[in-house]
């Protein structure tokens, strides 16, 4: 039995199969995403979803889906599946599914009477193209396949409806057609590796619904355009490949291309290999720049997410060169920001006050994975520029006070990772001395001090250490309370006593102002009140305002976003903290905690981790189907565990 295998019983039960999604991407930000029964349930779903830079910086759904029909003796068996009004599903092709497997590539096996048909999909790595291979495993009479493409040509943020502006024109190309519904879009080429007949029958399929959007309180129906259908005969043992892309391809190359792409894939045959494959999906290369996307299907490259994710997505899977490529792009953005220049790359939210400190943390992980010497040679000047920028009080919203702590104004704007807003106002106004920002600050001071001292700059090292002494003393005085945990933020007489996970970073980081007893007290309360099988809760059930369920319309979800939901990426730092306290004796506990996350490999987005979970049982996955920080941090912990187990 393969690691990611789903049998007929699960597949034909839509309550079980529809919540499970698959995601495949290439390095340009394009992707294919749908459910494991190929029924689109989100406006973001599609067979071919690509960036169209001349229109905007969003992705666009070109080919929404492809309905297949098996024809024998004039009888038609449609394998497609769409949801329409009134919980009506048609044409119910899922009832023919015998099994689905995606350990290597997504493969669905259908049984229609005496016909056994296997469908395999692969998203090409280095171009915007999806290939689908149909193999007739068994048949006792002449068989024809019909392919009916459903076109959208719209942004993932919008819907399309029947209209007179959509072009119905098409042109024949070798073994297929090309078409483009609206100006500004690339042409869509749909071709087969075998001669076929295209029947031009333009039609709009009206009222297709996306239940995931309905759950989230958004509009949820659209019309999709079908230009006609392809028909091709297929023999027992024969394979036919359908290609959809934005450039023409020689049909004679399709078989070779498909096989080469398959050979290039790492099977998802374990927890680690699932996460490693998922890690590769967040990389986005645009000309000279290399980014990390925060998540799929709707996130872009956000600075904080990128720096938190970078070590886990690269160093933890032994891809140091990828780390350096991403950091080269990030370095340009950091230099732009420090110099007060417009940021000339697509990294968003560079001005958030913790971003530069997370960049230092990421480089600290690089130093640990390579060497301090290599880090100093490659990034020493950047680290010194960052620390000097903050110490000279040049940051727009990071103010170094005489007590050595950093102050940030978040009263009117969400400035940390807890960034939900309603009507333009932060749901959690974290302002003043913020606990993880100052933990990052202390860690950065000590790390850079050690780095530059080893490089011969004792004067700067002594200055940074002196600063850290002041910062560390104030940190304990300001944040630690009589109950042994840390206040979340402090602004004058205003103190946030909520039990939140942001204190765990102080225990996890290499350098901490807390002693071992103080660290253990923090770890104990986090374990007792915030730990779940899926991550750390963002708020203790004992604190006021606890709301563990991320459900309902946008506003309701925004209020719940960081008020009790559980986030897997925090588990990474929690496990690191646990191992710092308990060392070898903590390994078995950490390994047990990972079981709840490995269980997610066959749920939600198969082979990846979603954005967040409800904070109470059954801890249902919510939000974006695949989230970079979550995947990264669990990979980082798996790498850390491997070092302990040497």
What are these regions (language model features)?
Residues 1-267, 297, 304, 319, ...:
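Terminal accessory carbohydrate-recognition/targeting modules of carbohydrate-active enzymes
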Residues 138-139, 160-163, 172, 234-236, ...:
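Aromatic-rich carbohydrate-recognition surfaces in CAZymes
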Residues 243-277, 308-313, 318-328, 516-529:
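Carboxylate/His-rich catalytic cores and anion/metal-binding grooves
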Residues 277-285, 328-336, 599-606:
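Glycine-rich, acidic and aromatic/proline-enriched surface loops and short helix-turn segments
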Residues 280-301, 339-358, 362, 366, ...:
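Carbohydrate-binding/catalytic loop surfaces
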């Amino acid at each position: 039995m393969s690691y990611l295998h789903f049998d007929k019983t699960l597949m034909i039960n839509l309550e079980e199969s529809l919540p499970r999604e698959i995601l495949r991407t290439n390095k340009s930000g394009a992707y294919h995403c749908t459910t494991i029964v190929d029924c689109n349930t989100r406006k973001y779903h599609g067979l071919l979803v690509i960036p169209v830079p001349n229109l905007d910086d969003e992705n666009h759904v070109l080919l929404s889906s492809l309905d297949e029909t098996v024809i024998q003796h004039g009888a038609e068996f449609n394998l497609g599946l769409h949801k329409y009004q009134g919980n009506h599903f048609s044409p119910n092709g899922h009832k023919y599914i015998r099994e689905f497997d995606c350990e290597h590539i997504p493969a669905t096996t259908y049984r229609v009477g005496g016909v056994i048909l296997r469908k395999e999909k692969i998203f090409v790595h280095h171009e915007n193209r999806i290939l689908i291979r149909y193999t007739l495993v068994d048949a006792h009479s002449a068989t024809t396949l019909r392919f009916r493409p459903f076109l959208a040509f719209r942004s993932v943020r919008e819907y399309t409806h029947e209209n007179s502006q959509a072009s119905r024109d098409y042109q024949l190309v070798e073994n297929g057609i090309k078409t483009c519904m609206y100006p500004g879009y690339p042409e869509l080429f749909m071709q087969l590796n075998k001669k076929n007949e295209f029947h031009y029958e333009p039609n709009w399929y009206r009222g297709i619904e996306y239940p995931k959007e309905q759950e989230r309180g958004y509009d949820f129906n659209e019309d999709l355009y079908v230009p006609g259908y392809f028909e091709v005969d297929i023999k027992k043992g024969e394979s036919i490949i359908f290609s959809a892309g934005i450039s023409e391809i020689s049909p004679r190359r399709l078989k070779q291309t498909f096989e080469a792409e398959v050979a290039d894939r790492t099977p998802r045959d374990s927890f680690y290999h699932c996460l490693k494959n998922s890690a590769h999906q967040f990389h986005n290369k645009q000309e000279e720049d290399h980014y990390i996307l925060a998540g799929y299907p709707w996130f872009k490259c956000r600075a904080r997410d990128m720096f938190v994710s970078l070590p886990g997505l690269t160093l933890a899977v032994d891809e140091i060169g990828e780390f350096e490529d991403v950091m080269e792009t990030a370095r340009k953005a950091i230099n732009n920001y420090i110099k007060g220049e417009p940021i000339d790359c697509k990294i968003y939210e560079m001005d958030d006050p913790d971003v530069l400190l997370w960049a230092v943390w990421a480089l600290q992980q690089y130093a640990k994975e390579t060497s301090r010497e290599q880090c100093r040679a490659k990034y020493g000047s950047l680290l010194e520029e960052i620390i000097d920028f903050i110490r000279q009080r040049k940051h727009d919203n990071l103010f170094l006070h005489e007590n050595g702590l950093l102050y940030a104004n978040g009263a009117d704007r969400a400035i940390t990772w807890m960034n939900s807003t309603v009507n333009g106002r932060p749901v959690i106004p974290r302002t003043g001395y913020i606990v993880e920002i100052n933990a990052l600050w202390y860690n950065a001071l000590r790390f850079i001090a050690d780095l530059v001292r080893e490089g011969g700059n004792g004067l700067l090292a002594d200055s940074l250490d002196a600063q850290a002494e002041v910062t560390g003393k104030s940190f304990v005085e300001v944040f630690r309370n009589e109950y042994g945990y840390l206040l979340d933020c402090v602004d004058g007489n205003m103190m946030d006593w909520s039990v939140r996970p942001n204190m765990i970073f102080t225990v996890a980081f290499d350098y901490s102002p807390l002693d071992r007893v103080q660290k253990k007290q923090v770890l104990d309360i986090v374990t007792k009140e915030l730990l779940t099988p899926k991550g750390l809760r963002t708020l203790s059930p004992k604190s006021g305002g606890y709301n563990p369920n991320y459900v309902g319309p946008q506003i309701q979800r925004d209020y719940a976003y960081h008020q009790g939901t559980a986030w897997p990426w925090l588990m990474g730092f929690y496990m690191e903290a646990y191992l710092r306290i308990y060392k070898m004796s903590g390994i078995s506990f950490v390994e047990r905690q990972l079981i709840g996350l490995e269980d997610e490999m066959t749920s939600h987005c198969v082979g990846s981790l979603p954005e967040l979970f409800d904070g109470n049982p059954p801890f249902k996955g919510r939000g974006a189907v695949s989230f970079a920080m979550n995947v990264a941090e669990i990979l980082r912990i798996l790498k850390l565990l491997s070092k302990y187990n040497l």
